[in-house]
Each structure stands twice: as structure tokens, then as C-alpha cells.
Amino acid sequence: MALNIENIVAELETATILELSELVKAIEEKFDVSAAAPVAVAGPAAGGAAEEQTEFTVELTAAGDQKVKVIKAVREATGLGLKEAKAVVDGAPAPVKEAVSKEEAEALKAALEEVGASVTVK
């Protein structure tokens, strides 16, 4: 008995979902294969398709000549006490504020640069 593709397709058209499911299982067992679709693993996105950054870190890279004014600006921006703000300024490069919006990061950067500090936004 020769296999005829048209006859097989005609038989499959008349089969129920349950019968087709059993057929798939039988083929998987007989030929040691899987009917599951392979899942493609996505690599890192290309530069143009990368997500836009929404959270930024403002980092003090250097205090500059007006250290006292920089400490005051850090205190105002973060709500830190004098000792903590001084520790941030003395520990430069150090993050001043993390996970802030772009607007807040730019405003903080401008305020710190206005008093002579060197600042980067990451």
C-alpha cells in the first residue's frame, strides 16, 4: 500500500481534535521529537531599538572651589543632614540622587554646576 499525501490529508481533515492530539503524541513518541515550537532567544536590542532610559542617577564628580556652597546645594536637593551631605561631597565621585526623572536630574545638575561642582547624569 503506497502512501498518498492527498489521502493522508483527506483523513486528517475528517479527524477530530482529540484524534489529532493523539496522533501528535504518537508521532512524538515514535520518532522521539517534540511538536513544541522552538522559542527564539532574543539578543540585546540594537542601538536604535533600545528602550529609552527613564531613571537617572546624578553623580557629583568633583566639588570644585566652593565646597561649602556645594554642600548646601546637596543638602537642599536631598534633604540630608550636614554631616551626610559633607560625606557625599568629600567622597566625590559619589551619587547625589538615584532613580530620578530626567527633568529632576537636569535641574539638580544645573543647581550643582551653578555653585561650581562637576556633575554627571547617568
Swiss-Prot record:
Gene3D superfamilies assigned: 3.30.1390.10, Single helix bin (1.20.5.710)
SUPFAM superfamilies on file: ClpS-like (SSF54736), Ribosomal protein L7/12, oligomerisation (N-terminal) domain (SSF48300)
InterPro entries in the record: Ribosomal_bL12 (IPR000206), Ribosomal_bL12_C (IPR013823), Ribosomal_bL12_C/ClpS-like (IPR014719), Ribosomal_bL12_oligo (IPR008932), Ribosomal_bL12_oligo_N_sf (IPR036235)
Pfam families: Ribosomal_L12, Ribosomal_L12_N
Keywords for this protein: Ribonucleoprotein, Ribosomal protein
CC annotations in GO: cytosolic large ribosomal subunit
GO BP terms in the entry: translation
GO molecular function per UniProt: mRNA binding; structural constituent of ribosome
Keyword Ribosomal protein annotated: yes
Protein family: Belongs to the bacterial ribosomal protein bL12 family.
Protein role: Forms part of the ribosomal stalk which helps the ribosome interact with GTP-bound translation factors. Is thus essential for accurate translation.
PANTHER family (UniProt xref): 39S RIBOSOMAL PROTEIN L12, LARGE RIBOSOMAL SUBUNIT PROTEIN BL12M
NCBIfam families: L12 (TIGR00855)
Subunit structure: Homodimer. Part of the ribosomal stalk of the 50S ribosomal subunit. Forms a multimeric L10(L12)X complex, where L10 forms an elongated spine to which 2 to 4 L12 dimers bind in a sequential fashion. Binds GTP-bound translation factors.
Protein's name in the database: Large ribosomal subunit protein bL12
Species of the source: Enterococcus faecalis (strain ATCC 700802 / V583)
Organism classification: Bacteria, Bacillati, Bacillota, Bacilli, Lactobacillales
Chain's gene name: rplL
